[in-house]
Regions:
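Hydrophobic anchor at the beta1->P-loop junction of P-loop NTPases
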Residues: 26
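P-loop (Walker A) phosphate-binding loop of NTP-binding proteins
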Residues: 29
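ATP-binding Walker
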Residues: 32
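Walker A/P-loop
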Residues: 35
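ATP-dependent small-molecule kinase phosphotransfer cores
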Residues: 54-116
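Conserved phosphate-donor/acceptor-positioning beta-strand/loop module used by diverse small-molecule
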Residues: 109-113, 127-147
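Small-molecule kinase domains that catalyze NTP-dependent phosphoryl transfer to phosphate-bearing small molecules
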Residues: 151-195, 207
Length: 207
């Protein structure tokens, strides 16, 4: 059984930002397409994605320079945690993940789970304006995507089941700003998502 320990540490003494930084939160189950689309959107629109710090090793499909994480040793992770603090910290099966405040300040898109998004919206609302986009895909399509990236059915079901409780609650609450049903080709999904983000950024400029 997958063991998940989640806690959040908000660094004290942070200066309040007068104009709220706009950050898009990409949330979705395993293989919903959120991470691939986030990378494409960043390249296309010139945006930057939050990269969390982790003690796990890179996967074989994580291309150098395009990873969603900074891979560090246990000692380096603890050093960063002590010196900078983490806005969010999660431990999954003994593997640690953390995100610093400055990383979010300097980024535009954050691929995050529902619990992390809830915490950020509750504790960082004075510094950031978060727009929450929930990526939903049909079960069989998500499984097919997962298998095409060299994952196994066993691994897919394990991940899907381990995240089911928090996502079921999240889906029932419907607290997101946009529901993005990703049941289309990558190119069509990318085009639709680009239009959505550009629209939101234009609204922000007009304020």
């Amino acid at each position: 059984m997958m063991k998940i320990i989640t806690s959040y540490i908000y660094r004290k003494g942070m200066k309040q930002i007068m104009h709220k930084k706009l950050v898009f939160l990409f949330i979705g189950r395993t293989a919903s397409g959120k991470s691939s689309l986030a990378r494409y959107i960043c390249e296309t629109l010139g945006l930057r994605q939050v990269k969390s710090i982790t003690t796990r090793l890179p996967r074989k499909d994580e291309i150098t320079g395009y990873e969603d994480h900074y891979f560090v040793s246990e000692s380096k992770f603890d050093e960063i945690k002590f010196k900078e603090g983490f806005v969010a910290y999660t431990e999954i099966n003994g593997i640690k993940y953390g995100t610093t405040y400055n990383e979010i300040v300097n980024s535009d898109i954050y691929v995050i789970d529902p619990n992390g998004a809830k915490y950020l919206k509750e504790h960082c609302k004075d510094e950031f304006k978060f727009i929450e986009i929930y990526f939903s895909s049909p079960f069989e399509l998500a499984k097919d995507r997962f298998l095409k990236r060299d994952g196994s059915e066993e691994e897919f079901y394990s991940r899907y089941n381990s995240e089911d409780e928090q996502f079921t609650k999240y889906e029932e609450a419907e607290g997101y700003d946009h529901l993005f049903v990703n049941d289309m080709s990558f190119s069509k999904a990318a085009e639709a998502l680009c239009d959505l983000l550009k629209s939101e950024m234009e609204k922000e400029k007009s304020l």
